[in-house]
Amino acid sequence: YDDGVNLDTLGSPGSYANSLAIASVDNAGFTGTYFQVGQRMFSYTETTGYSNEPLATIPGEYDYIFIDGFGTEEDFAALNGALEGKIAFCSRGSTSFYQKAEAAVKYGAVATIVYNNQPGSINMDLSDYTQSQPCVSILQSDGARIRSVSEPVTDDGGQELYRTGTM
């Protein structure tokens, strides 16, 4: 009986036909990581084994910039310095994960959060990342939720440039 969707792992022999698997309530090895936007918690996938620090190394509240773009250098340059000292949110796609993070850091980001552009989680490869600022990923649906609660920032003509908030 399972009445909720959650992160789980099922291995052999429990995954074989005609077998019975029992879930354990003791978890000595996996603790979920999350950040908060508004009143909601969002889990993320930490990218480890590269030069980047964990997201938890930047404690406290930070403002963020949420762009609808892929996190190219041009996307971040167009923010005209607004990213300085903030966390960057950008979409998966168009450029490699390390290029997104490198570009965000170049324009002042203290961390980069990549939201998936399709359902499911991302296992990012940051092999060529040369910075220490954190870079993590979140689900597409979580990216959409964060975008929806973020405040739009517009130019003088009313065109949306990006969205912002605090986490």
Label every PLM stretch briefly:
Residues 1-167:
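Structured lumen-facing ectodomains of secretory-pathway proteins
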